[in-house]
């Protein structure tokens, strides 16, 4: 069990639920006013750590008022050590006035109160708690000198320090030098470094700024894109977990507190800890409010287990679709082998059938990875340049809509996949149930570009309202396709005309291919205990 000290703010949240934010001079009526909910970044992070099983002590400063009594009662209920809570008669307990719109996004105005009265002397009076901790977490809703004092004590005694630089402000070099781990969100990172957070390249540039100031690990939360971590030797973007957004209040605090409860001091389990924290945040945003929305360890582990069960079921459905498709393949043909995890199931299934039934089937691959797998299995492979056409290609898809239009390219093989698909007399796609959707809007579309013209395409996409991002490998190098090109990801807009988008992209100098596969799939096979097949010829 991690022993965590949180030095930070406590606020009582006054929450307004609004349809939209008022313009200057505008008066709007509201239907809901939630009064006296516990909040404050320090308190939220402490509660998140405690509910995730950490031995948590909270050093905070409260007024001598009813709000303080309510907050302390809540701290006790969560099993936190409150021996180091400080009370003052000079200031009221801090308050936060929060508006939440119908999409769940929030704006927050903070009255510091007793929080802003915390001094280095206050912190020093509770140094024994810090000395005996594994790590100390602090934010910027208390005066910076108090944070510096806490971190000085920690560093003198080998205690790890985590700084959540929120709200963002210019920080003294002294504080940065005392910080082991820093956890800004994307706007806070940009404020501190002057580098806008747009993609993994800019995230890494932000991280290097902090590395140069002695910080050992940087974690940037990037909202719907997930969270990014970097050390001098490693970095990765951890995806978010899909959830219906009700209220984003306390999501970042939940992430930090739950992460701190799970992260080993040597940082060896960073990916696992961040996945845990991402699940915790996904639960938080589904509930209105701050501290009442912070999940327990049991709730987080339950959703993680459900996610693992879902992944297991998805793999089962992939294998079922692949096995069904393998039974449909006729003898004496040239067969196109798709790319990706679902196609790999098919390659193994058709190879088994070729061996069992002594079929005369020759194959072409749509990626180097598929070719290596097929050759390892001893399948008869052809060079695509030596044939005029392919009789049948079986491939997976990233997503398929009800008109059998799809997106491919998540596996970085979209050019070869499209070339073989165009050569094929028939194309069968195999997917699990999660890949079949009403619309391609909102999904990631991959665009393959030549390295020389990549930035020109990137600028075109940005100027036309997309948010393009280059694809990178885990080690930070730009991802190259089997043909040596780069990949750019965009999100398909809600109102996109797919045909027009396809044509417009192909017109751009530097674009080699894109991942929209329109009117290509002849038959879709969806895995499951009851296989579902959809043929283009049956569509109305």
From Swiss-Prot:
Superkingdom, natural source: Bacteria
GO molecular function: ATP binding; metal ion binding; ribokinase activity; ribose-5-phosphate isomerase activity
Notes on how activity is controlled: Activated by a monovalent cation that binds near, but not in, the active site. The most likely occupant of the site in vivo is potassium. Also activated by ammonium ion. Ion binding induces a conformational change that may alter substrate affinity.
CDD domains: ribokinase, RPI_A
Protein residues bound to ATP: 185, 221-226, 252-253
Protein's pathway: Carbohydrate metabolism; D-ribose degradation; D-ribose 5-phosphate from beta-D-ribopyranose: step 2/2; Carbohydrate degradation; pentose phosphate pathway; D-ribose 5-phosphate from D-ribulose 5-phosphate (non-oxidative stage): step 1/1
Region (Ribose-5-phosphate isomerase A): 309-540
Keyword Isomerase: yes
Catalytic activity: D-ribose + ATP = D-ribose 5-phosphate + ADP + H(+); aldehydo-D-ribose 5-phosphate = D-ribulose 5-phosphate
Reported induction: By elevated hydrostatic pressure.
Binding site for substrate 2: 339-342, 395-398, 408-411, 435
UniProt-listed Pfam families: PfkB (PF00294), Rib_5-P_isom_A (PF06026)
Binding-site list for substrate 1: 253
Entry similarity comment: In the N-terminal section; belongs to the carbohydrate kinase PfkB family. Ribokinase subfamily.
Functional summary from the UniProt entry: Bifunctional enzyme that catalyzes the phosphorylation of ribose at O-5 in a reaction requiring ATP and magnesium, and the reversible conversion of ribose 5-phosphate to ribulose 5-phosphate.
Protein name, per record: Bifunctional ribokinase/ribose-5-phosphate isomerase A
Organism: Fructilactobacillus sanfranciscensis (strain ATCC 27651 / DSM 20451 / JCM 5668 / CCUG 30143 / KCTC 3205 / NCIMB 702811 / NRRL B-3934 / L-12)
Gene: rbsK/rbiA
């Amino acid at each position: 069990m991690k022993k965590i000290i949180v030095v930070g703010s406590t606020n009582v949240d006054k929450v307004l639920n609004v349809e939209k934010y008022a313009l200057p001079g505008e008066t709007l009526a509201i239907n809901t006013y939630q009064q006296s909910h516990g909040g404050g970044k320090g308190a939220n992070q402490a509660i998140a750590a405690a509910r995730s099983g950490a031995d948590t002590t909270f050093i905070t400063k409260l007024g001598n008022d009813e709000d303080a009594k309510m907050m302390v009662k809540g701290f006790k209920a969560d099993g936190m050590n409150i021996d180091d809570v400080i009370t003052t008669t000079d200031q009221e307990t801090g308050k936060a006035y929060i508006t939440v719109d119908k999409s769940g996004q929030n704006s927050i105005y903070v009255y510091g109160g007793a929080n802003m009265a915390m001094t280095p002397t206050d912190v020093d009076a509770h140094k024994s708690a810090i000395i005996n901790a594994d790590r100390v977490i602090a934010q910027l809703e208390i005066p910076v000198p108090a944070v510096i004092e806490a971190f000085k004590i920690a560093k003198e005694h080998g205690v790890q320090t985590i700084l959540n630089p929120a709200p963002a402000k210019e920080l003294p070099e002294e504080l940065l030098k005392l910080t082991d781990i820093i956890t800004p969100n994307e706007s806070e990172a940009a404020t501190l470094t002057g580098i806008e957070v747009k993609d993994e390249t800019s995230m890494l540039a932000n991280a290097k700024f902090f590395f140069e100031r002695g910080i050992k690990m940087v974690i940037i939360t990037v909202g719907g894109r997930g969270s990014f971590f970097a050390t001098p030797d490693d970095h990765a973007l951890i995806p978010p977990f899909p959830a219906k957004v009700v209220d984003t209040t306390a999501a970042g605090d939940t992430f930090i507190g739950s992460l701190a409860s799970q992260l080993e001091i040597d940082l060896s389990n960073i990916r696992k800890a961040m996945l845990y924290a991402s699940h915790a945040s996904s639960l938080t945003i589904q509930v209105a409010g701050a501290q009442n929305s912070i999940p327990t360890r049991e709730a987080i582990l339950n959703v993680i287990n459900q996610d693992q069960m879902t992944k297991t079921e998805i793999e089962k459905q992939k294998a079922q679709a692949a096995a069904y498709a393998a039974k449909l393949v006729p003898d004496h043909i040239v067969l196109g082998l798709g790319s990706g995890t679902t196609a790999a199931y098919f390659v193994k299934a058709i190879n088994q059938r070729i061996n069992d039934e002594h079929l005369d089937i020759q194959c072409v691959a749509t990626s180097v990875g598929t070719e290596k797998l097929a050759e390892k299995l001893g399948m008869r492979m052809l060079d695509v340049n030596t044939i005029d056409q392919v009789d049948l290609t079986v491939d997976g898809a990233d997503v398929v809509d009800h008109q059998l239009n799809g997106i491919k390219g998540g596996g970085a093989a979209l050019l070869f996949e499209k070339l073989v698909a165009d050569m094929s007399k028939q194309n069968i796609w195999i997917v699990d149930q999660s890949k079949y959707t009403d619309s391609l809007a909102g999904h990631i579309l991959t665009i393959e570009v030549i390295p020389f013209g990549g930035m020109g395409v990137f600028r075109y996409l940005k100027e036309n309202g997309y948010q393009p991002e280059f694809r990178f490998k885990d080690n930070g190098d730009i991802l190259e396709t089997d043909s040596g090109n780069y990949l750019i990801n965009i999100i398909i807009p809600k109102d996109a005309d797919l045909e027009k988008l396809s044509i417009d992209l192909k017109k751009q100098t530097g674009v080699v291919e894109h991942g929209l596969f329109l009117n290509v799939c002849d038959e879709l096979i969806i895995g499951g205990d009851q296989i579902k097949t959809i043929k283009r010829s049956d569509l109305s």
